């Protein structure tokens, strides 16, 4: 029993999909062991009297039989099963739930829309970096949750009865992707939103985070098409035009959109456009977790960390036995360089955070081998679970670590989409210099330096006589100037 007592499972019986998440608690954080998702499309089985069809219920039970096999090894007190919008609505939900409990061998709780919204917010708060004050949007199959909050506390919670399955059945039933279908779907969504918009705006937010299949699909499309990961109204409108151009739902083809997500994508897109328009949202990013993560963290009674990225970096440093003092030393030098050039280069605060994060992890490759350490570092960072970092930010960190020393691979810096290519180049230059000047691994051996930027020219001024007194240091700096010059990054050292 010992090896299973640290296992926890969260099951979400959604209106579009059923999901199961199995995790292991490791030193106050969670390690994902299993994620299973099945498209059950329960909401599509509701008739005009809100009764679930036998076929829809059978699809659900069939899925739960798969889940039940995995649950046998987990203590019942460490399993939570919740049902959302469709089972709140269905007049025969009792029949479905009775059999579901029999199959799973544990209670199934039908949660209110507000409780669902609260759990979604907790899942986001535990797994998503960025500003403290946030608006969270989750478009489900039959309901949409909108939550504002600061840190771990929610300030307003709304669960609205519109979702990508119900809007599909209502506004895209003819399977046409016409302008009029989108217009009707958006208009209806805006009417549902209007009564709650004022209160959401009153509480306000600094960042907007999306936590649903629709937003996940958008992220996958944008990554596949090499765009940056920020979702904007302009991008949503472009995708709508692309969908209209395809004409029919069965002919919908967009680079990066999987067949599995395509069916409910137009309806989800229409709802999201309405949310952006009605709430005047400038940009949205993808959340690291939502309802299932909220359930798991709730069972574990873990406090929400103020800075999720810092917790992630600490855990990784411990796990891979990174020299934390050295990581801090490099980070301090890099931060000093960044502060000296940020105005000339018009760098944003998030770029500073990502540079410091790269410094904290730059020696992770040594845990594999000194040979090709940068390649090992890039591989590890690209493939590790890093709560608080978006997929594009992970890719940027991996690219910076790949280019921390040796000749520079410019194309890799241009293939990431977390920041503009020029910014990635600038962060890479600062990281490389910081690693060089902290390489003696002692604070008292880091020289006092000034770094000036004039367009792309960097001028580094060292203490009088430093280059003469440090012949190896001079050789390393000369080599670095040469490597940077190969990719047209002028560097002068005095």
From Swiss-Prot:
InterPro entries per the UniProt record, alphabetical: ATPase_NBD, GppA/Ppx_hydrolase, Guo-5TP_3DP_PyrP, Ppx_GppA_C, Ppx_GppA_N, PyroPPase_GppA_Ppx
Origin: domain of life: Bacteria
One protein family per Pfam: Ppx-GppA_III
The EC number(s) this enzyme carries: 3.6.1.40
Enzyme class, broadest EC rank: hydrolase
Keyword Plastid among UniProt keywords: no
Pathways per UniProt: Purine metabolism; ppGpp biosynthesis; ppGpp from GTP: step 2/2
CDD domains linked to this entry: ASKHA_NBD_EcGppA-like
GO biological process per UniProt: guanosine pentaphosphate catabolic process; guanosine tetraphosphate biosynthetic process; nucleobase-containing small molecule interconversion
GO molecular function annotations of the record: guanosine-5'-triphosphate,3'-diphosphate diphosphatase activity
Protein keywords: Hydrolase
Metal-binding listed as a keyword: no
Reaction catalyzed: guanosine 3'-diphosphate 5'-triphosphate + H2O = guanosine 3',5'-bis(diphosphate) + phosphate + H(+)
SUPFAM superfamilies: Actin-like ATPase domain, HD-domain/PDEase-like
Family, similarity comment: Belongs to the GppA/Ppx family. GppA subfamily.
Protein task: Catalyzes the conversion of pppGpp to ppGpp. Guanosine pentaphosphate (pppGpp) is a cytoplasmic signaling molecule which together with ppGpp controls the 'stringent response', an adaptive process that allows bacteria to respond to amino acid starvation, resulting in the coordinated regulation of numerous cellular activities.
Protein name: Guanosine-5'-triphosphate,3'-diphosphate pyrophosphatase
The organism of origin for this protein: Escherichia fergusonii (strain ATCC 35469 / DSM 13698 / CCUG 18766 / IAM 14443 / JCM 21226 / LMG 7866 / NBRC 102419 / NCTC 12128 / CDC 0568-73)
């Amino acid at each position: 029993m010992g090896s299973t007592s640290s296992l926890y499972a969260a099951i979400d019986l959604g209106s579009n999909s059923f999901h199961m998440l199995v995790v292991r608690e490791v030193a106050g954080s969670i390690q994902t062991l299993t994620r299973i998702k099945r498209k059950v499309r329960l909401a599509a089985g509701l008739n005009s009297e809100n009764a679930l069809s036998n076929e829809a219920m059978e699809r659900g039970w069939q899925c739960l039989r798969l889940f039940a096999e995995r649950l046998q090894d987990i203590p019942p007190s460490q399993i939570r099963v919740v049902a959302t919008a469709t089972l709140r609505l269905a007049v025969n939900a009792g029949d479905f739930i009775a059999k579901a409990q029999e199959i799973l061998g544990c209670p199934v709780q039908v949660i209110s829309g507000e409780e669902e919204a609260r759990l979604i917010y907790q899942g986001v708060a535990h797994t998503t970096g960025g500003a403290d004050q946030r608006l969270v949007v989750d478009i489900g199959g039959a309901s949409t949750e909108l939550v504002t909050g600061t840190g771990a506390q929610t300030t307003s919670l709304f669960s609205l009865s519109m979702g990508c399955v119900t809007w599909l059945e209502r506004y895209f039933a003819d399977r046409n992707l016409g302008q009029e279908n989108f217009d009707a779907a958006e208009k209806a969504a805006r009417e549902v939103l209007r009564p709650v918009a004022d209160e959401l705006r009153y509480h306000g937010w600094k960042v907007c985070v999306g936590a649903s299949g629709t937003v996940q699909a958008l992220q996958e499309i944008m990554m596949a098409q090499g765009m940056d990961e920020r979702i904007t109204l302009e991008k949503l409108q472009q995708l709508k035009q692309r969908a209209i151009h395809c004409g029919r739902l069965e002919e919908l083809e967009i680079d990066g959109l999987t067949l599995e997500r395509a069916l409910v994508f137009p309806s989800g897109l229409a709802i999201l456009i309405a949310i952006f328009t009605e709430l005047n949202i400038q940009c949205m990013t993808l959340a690291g977790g939502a309802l299932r993560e909220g359930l798991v963290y709730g069972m574990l009674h873990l406090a929400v960390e103020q800075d999720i990225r810092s917790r992630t970096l600490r855990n990784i440093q411990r796990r891979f036995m990174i020299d934390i003092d050295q990581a801090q030393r490099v980070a301090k030098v890099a931060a000093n360089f960044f502060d000296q050039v940020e105005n000339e280069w018009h760098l944003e605060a998030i770029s500073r955070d990502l540079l410091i994060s790269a410094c904290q992890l730059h020696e992770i490759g040594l845990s594999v081998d000194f040979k090709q350490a940068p390649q090992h570092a890039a591989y590890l960072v690209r493939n590790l679970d890093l709560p608080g970092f978006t997929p594009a930010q992970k890719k940027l960190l991996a690219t910076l670590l790949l280019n921390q020393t040796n000749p520079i691979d410019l194309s890799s810096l241009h293939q990431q989409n977390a920041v503009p290519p020029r910014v990635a180049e600038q962060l890479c230059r600062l990281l490389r210099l910081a690693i060089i000047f902290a390489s003696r691994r002692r604070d008292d051996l880091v020289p006092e330096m000034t770094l000036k930027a004039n367009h792309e020219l960097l001028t580094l001024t060292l203490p009088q006589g430093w280059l003469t007194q440090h012949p190896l240091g001079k050789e390393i700096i000369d080599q670095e100037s040469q490597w940077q010059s190969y990719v047209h990054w002028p560097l002068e050292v005095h």
